[in-house]
């Protein structure tokens, strides 16, 4: 099963390249920097990043799987974030020089043989002049997003993503995480 951003969403992400970061915000983005909706504000534009859940089917099993999506930012969302003090100005004024997708590949094995593969975009990373801002899903099955500021970018520095993939005497799974430049 594949659960990745669409070409249109990747194009929306590219629209903030080479712009100056103004702030990160969200109507419910409290000081722990977790929410299902995050606003990336630049000097020229606003881009929303939203976590959502959808029914998916993997190897005949129906389950809720989360996704990360880009979306429009409504004036009301910005006003709510401002009203509640949920705007964060760390790294303000720095240019967004690159954008990466964070893609996970989860492979399930039964009796040592590959049984299924789940590919999912679990986040985005903005490369700035003095570090990075990552917006990643916290789980494969819930919509919560986490904003993380990083000095150095590596897959090991990103928050772990939790899942409900079971391990027993016959089955296990492996995870491969990669960064893909857009």
Task: Describe every region a protein language model picked out.
Residues 1-182:
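Surface-exposed, interaction-prone regions used to assemble/regulate multi-protein complexes
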């Amino acid at each position: 099963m594949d659960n990745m951003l669409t070409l249109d969403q990747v194009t929306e992400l590219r629209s903030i390249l080479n712009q100056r970061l103004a702030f990160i915000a969200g109507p419910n983005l409290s000081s722990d920097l977790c929410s299902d909706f995050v606003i990336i504000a630049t000097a020229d534009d606003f881009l929303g990043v939203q976590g959502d859940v959808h029914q998916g089917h993997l190897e005949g099993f129906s389950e809720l799987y989360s996704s990360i999506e880009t979306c429009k930012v409504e004036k009301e969302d910005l006003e709510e974030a401002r009203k509640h003090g949920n705007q964060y100005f760390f790294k303000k004024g720095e240019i967004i020089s690159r954008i990466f997708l964070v893609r996970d590949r989860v492979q399930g094995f039964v009796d040592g043989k590959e049984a299924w593969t789940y590919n999912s975009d679990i986040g985005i990373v903005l490369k700035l002049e003095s570090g990075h801002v990552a917006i990643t899903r916290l789980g494969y099955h819930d919509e919560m997003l986490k904003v993380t500021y990083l000095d150095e970018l590596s897959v090991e520095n990103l928050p772990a993503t939790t899942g409900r993939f079971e391990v027993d005497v016959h089955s296990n799974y492996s995870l491969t995480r990669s960064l893909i430049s857009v």
